[in-house]
From Swiss-Prot:
Gene: rpsR
Gene Ontology annotations of biological process type: translation
Function: Binds as a heterodimer with protein bS6 to the central domain of the 16S rRNA, where it helps stabilize the platform of the 30S subunit.
Keyword RNA-binding: yes
Domain of life: Bacteria
GO molecular function terms noted in the UniProt entry: small ribosomal subunit rRNA binding; structural constituent of ribosome
Keyword annotations: Ribonucleoprotein, Ribosomal protein, RNA-binding, rRNA-binding
PANTHER family xrefs: 30S RIBOSOMAL PROTEIN S18 (PTHR13479), SMALL RIBOSOMAL SUBUNIT PROTEIN BS18M (PTHR13479:SF40)
Subunit structure of this chain's protein: Part of the 30S ribosomal subunit. Forms a tight heterodimer with protein bS6.
Protein known as: Small ribosomal subunit protein bS18
Source species: Flavobacterium johnsoniae (strain ATCC 17061 / DSM 2064 / JCM 8514 / BCRC 14874 / CCUG 350202 / NBRC 14942 / NCIMB 11054 / UW101)
Cited InterPro entries: Ribosomal_bS18, Ribosomal_bS18_sf
Any single Gene Ontology cellular-component annotation: cytosolic small ribosomal subunit
The family this protein is said to belong to: Belongs to the bacterial ribosomal protein bS18 family.
Amino acid sequence: MSTIEQSAKGKKDGDIRYLTPLNIETNKTKKYCRFKKSGIKYIDYKDADFLLKFVNEQGKILPRRLTGTSLKYQRKVSVAVKRARHLALMPYVADLLK
């Protein structure tokens, strides 16, 4: 038997199977809005260190499903990040921000 026939009959351990779904373990814990939890009403656009928690390495604003913030405070975070970018407190685009 040639190696092609053997590989067709028996699958090797290192083969990639595209048709089967990957078993990715996700974090099952519930995410809570840190602003509601601590009672923060105003998000300061001048606090760039705090706003860096809500952007990724490229400088893009992280979505709600990753940060766990509520819709109301996600809008306030996005406005604060955009204001900080406009005043050059935060970069618009970065190669590696963190």
